[in-house]
């Protein structure tokens, strides 16, 4: 968090997604969904969000009579946009900033409590959403991640939230080492780019591969196993194969 002063008033500004409150994140997602729907211009939405962060409830802060304060806020606005600009889905740093939605519990940070079966379903929906989405992919993603009943329809905020969290976790796992129990583990060896045009992660067919090993039991047993347990098992298998080739 960063402390600034607007006149005599101290304001605490978040410096990353880890610092934002539930209300700040919800407001951001509402504005972002409005931008995507074409209801508001992106720059206007970003200014509105920044005004919310600094608690500005008056005239436009960009036209303040106090030039020094106005210049300071403009500079801060540009600095802040580096990490929450609305030209892209937010990188939530693998943190679930919306743990509850209408009483429905979402996944833990880093999808810590998600089963392998649910993770694979989410990967399919994520892939669909990145290619050509008519809304079915983001709805499916939200239903799996928040275990929504058939009568509950996810809103735009929840759909964006699920896409953002899923993208953040997959990007972190597939791009390089991450810390697991104090040890750096490079899960990128599990993800094989170019495995097929319909398989951007390279994880298609992996469930059958793991089931054949019998480590987690049958096909159903693998799907019911924690996602991280299966990922670490796959990591060990990939590393063993690499050693055999040397």
Go through each PLM region and give its residues:
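An amphipathic, hydrophobic-aromatic interaction surface with interspersed Lys/Arg
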Residues: 1-246
